[in-house]
Amino acid sequence: MTDLHQTYYRQVKNPNPVFTPREGAGTLKFCEKLMEKAVGFTSRFDFAIHVAHARSKGLRRRMPPVLRRRAIDALLQ
């Protein structure tokens, strides 16, 4: 028998998070520019450098898992 916990295990509740703004809420131009720059931040070299720096200081042991990085990207939007 297969263990059900291994078959359906996920690291996050929503594996494909998406930012959805409120209806009727406007966004400032400055915020829109920041959101455009933040798209895909966790998959770029900059984020890898931040993680490497945190590892050198002893704050992290490894790069966050892919699903957690997707959640971070959604939060930056």
UniProtKB/Swiss-Prot annotation:
Query: Which BP terms from GO are recorded?
Result: DNA replication; plasmid maintenance
Which key words tag this protein in UniProt?
DNA replication, Plasmid, Plasmid copy control
The answer on whether this UniProt entry bears the keyword RNA-binding reads no
- Any idea what job this protein has? This protein is essential for plasmid replication; it is involved in copy control functions.
* Miscellaneous notes: This replication protein is compatible with the repA replicon for the IncFII R plasmids.
- Name this protein carries in UniProt: Replication initiation protein
Q: Which organism is it from?
A: Escherichia coli
Q: What gene makes this protein?
A: repA
